Amino acid sequence: MKVREVITYKHYFEDFFAEQPQKVRDKIIKILDIIEQIERVPAQYLKFIEGTNGLFEVRVQLASNIFRIFCFFDGNKFVVLLSGFQKKTQKTPKGEIEKAVKLMNEYYKEKENNTL
């Protein structure tokens, strides 16, 4: 049973997803299913990004490859998926976080103006 609905914003996630090998796409789908179905999602799959106003990262690991997909909650039911990237360093790159915050703000502005 779903406790939240996963939705995407524009084409950002779809573009990232389409570029990934099938094994990575399968793992992403598995984790998104967990996020949809579990009320309290473990931090190994979904983690708040410190210093942001509500931005989270979906955490995907396949062997030694680590991927992050930015998202946020709209109300308490929706996780909106933004951009994604393959993580190559210990810390999430600041530029990637800034891009995701910009997209999150853009989403809320469009929602407010009824242009979503």
Describe each region flagged by the PLM:
Residues L82:
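ATP-dependent carboxylate-activation loops
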Residues M1-I66, G75-V79, K87-L116:
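Basic, Lys/Arg-enriched alpha-helical interface segments
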